Curated annotation (Swiss-Prot):
One of its GO terms (molecular function) is D-glucose binding. This is Glucokinase. Disulfide bonds: none annotated. ATP binds at G7, D8, I9, G10, G11, T12. It is found in: Cytoplasm. It comes from the Bacteria. The gene is glk. PANTHER family: GLUCOKINASE. GO terms for cellular component: cytoplasm. CDD domains: ASKHA_NBD_GLK. Coiled coil: none annotated. Belongs to the bacterial glucokinase family. It comes from Nostoc sp. (strain PCC 7120 / SAG 25.82 / UTEX 2576). Its EC number is 2.7.1.2. Keywords: ATP-binding, Cytoplasm, Glycolysis, Kinase, Nucleotide-binding, Transferase.
Length: 342
C-alpha cells in the first residue's frame, strides 16, 4: 500500500485527504480535514498541521493538489490568496519526494475513474466505446471543459478554455439574450460562460425580468437586488444563482423557472457542441456544482433534445453516453489518482 496526499485547494476552502492505494488501484481514505484557506499564509503550514493532527506512523510518498486556477510550469498562483505554489519548493519543505499541481477541472477528469455507479446519473446510455475519447463539461462559477484521450493503458487529461468560446444563439429568445448582454456590458462578443454558469443563471434572470417576460416574486427580487447593489464588492452576502435555482426546483417562482429552462437549453446545446468536436463515445460527463442541485429540472427538460439537435449529425450524438457526476468530491478523488501516477 502506498500513502498519498490529495488536496483540493480553493480561494476560500481547502480539503486535504490522506489516501492509501492498493496494488489494484483501489483507494482507501485514511484521514480528511477541511480548512479556511485564508487562515494560512501558505499551503506548507496547513499541510504540516494536517499531518500532525492525522497522527499517522508513515509519511506520504506522493502528493497532488488540485488548484482553482491555471498551473504553469509546475507553479500556481491562486486568485483570491497570496499563495504562490511551486512543486520543487513544496517537495523540499514537506519532505514529499513526488508532488504535482493540476488544474481543478483536470482533477475532475482523473476523478472519473474513481467513481462508482451511484456517483453518476445517466441521462443517455448511448453505445460506449472503451477506446474512445471522454469529454467533461461543468457549469459552476464558470464553465469548465476538457477531454481525455487514451494513451497506452491510461487516459491523459487535457484541459481546455472552451467555456470562453462564443455563445451561439439558436432562436429568437436567445438572440435577444445575446443583444441584451452585449448592450448591458458594452462588449463586442459574449462567451458561452456568460450564459452557462452560475453568473449566467443570474444574467438570464435579469434579461427575462428587464424584458418583462415573466413576473418577479418579492423574495427572489430582494436577493437579486441585494446582489446587484453589492456589485464590485469582494464579499457578497447573497448567492442569487443558488436562490434562483432553488426556487425553480421548488416551482415557487415563475421567472426563476423560465430562467432555468433557458439555462438548461443552452447547457445542453453547448454540451452537444463539445460532443460534436470530440465524438466522446467513451462518455460525456457533466461536472460542476450546478447540475446536481437542479437534477429534477434537467431530467424533465429538453437538455438531451438540445444536446442532440445538430442537424444530420443527430444520430451520432444519440450514441454518446451522457452522465451527470453526483459526487462533488470527484476532484479530490482525481487528485489522489493523479498522485498515484507520479
Amino acid at each position: 500500500m502506498t500513502l498519498l496526499l490529495a488536496g483540493d485547494i480553493g480561494g476560500t476552502k481547502t480539503i486535504l485527504r490522506l489516501v492509501e492505494i492498493s496494488n489494484s488501484s483501489e483507494l482507501h481514505n485514511i484521514y480528511e480535514e477541511s480548512y479556511q484557506s485564508g487562515d494560512f499564509p501558505d499551503l506548507v503550514p496547513m499541510v504540516q498541521q494536517f499531518l500532525v493532527k492525522a497522527n499517522i506512523p508513515s509519511h506520504p510518498e506522493k502528493a497532488c493538489f488540485a488548484i482553482a486556477g491555471p498551473v504553469v510550469n509546475n507553479t500556481a498562483k491562486l486568485t483570491n490568496l497570496v499563495w504562490f505554489l511551486d512543486t520543487e519548493r513544496l517537495a523540499q519543505e514537506l519532505s514529499i519526494p513526488f508532488i504535482s499541481l493540476i488544474n481543478d477541472f483536470a482533477a475532475v477528469g482523473y476523478g472519473i475513474f474513481g467513481l462508482n455507479k451511484q456517483d453518476l446519473l445517466t441521462l443517455q446510455a448511448g453505445k460506449h466505446q472503451p477506446e474512445a475519447p471522454i469529454a467533461i463539461i461543468g457549469a459552476g462559477t464558470g464553465l469548465g471543459q476538457g477531454f481525455l484521450i487514451k494513451q497506452g493503458n491510461q487516459y491523459q487529461v487535457f484541459p481546455s478554455e472552451g467555456g470562453h468560446a462564443d455563445f451561439a444563439p439558436r432562436n429568437e429568445l436567445e438572440f435577444q439574450l445575446l443583444k441584451y448582454l452585449l448592450d448591458k456590458h458594452d462588449i463586442q462578443r459574449v462567451s458561452v460562460e456568460r450564459v452557462v454558469s452560475g453568473q449566467g443563471i443570474v444574467a438570464i434572470y435579469q434579461f427575462l425580468r428587464d424584458r418583462k417576460l415573466a413576473t418577479e416574486s418579492p423574495e427572489i427580487a430582494q436577493v437579486v437586488r441585494t446582489w446587484e447593489q453589492q456589485a464590485g464588492q469582494a464579499e457578497k452576502t447573497v448567492d442569487p444563482g443558488a436562490a434562483i435555482g432553488k426556487a425553480a426546483v421548488q416551482g415557487s417562482d415563475r421567472l426563476s423557472e423560465q430562467a432555468l429552462q433557458l439555462f438548461i437549453d443552452a447547457y445542453g446545446a453547448e454540451a452537444g457542441n463539445l460532443a460534436l468536436k470530440l465524438l466522446p463515445y467513451g462518455g460525456l460527463y457533466i461536472a460542476g456544482g450546478i447540475a446536481p442541485k437542479i437534477l429534477p429540472l434537467i431530467e424533465n427538460s429538453n437538455f438531451l433534445l438540445n444536446f442532440s439537435q445538430k442537424g444530420r449529425m443527430r444520430p451520432l450524438l444519440a450514441e454518446i453516453p451522457v452522465h451527470i457526476i453526483l459526487n462533488q468530491q470527484v476532484g479530490l478523488i482525481g487528485a489522489a489518482l493523479c498522485a498515484a501516477r507520479l
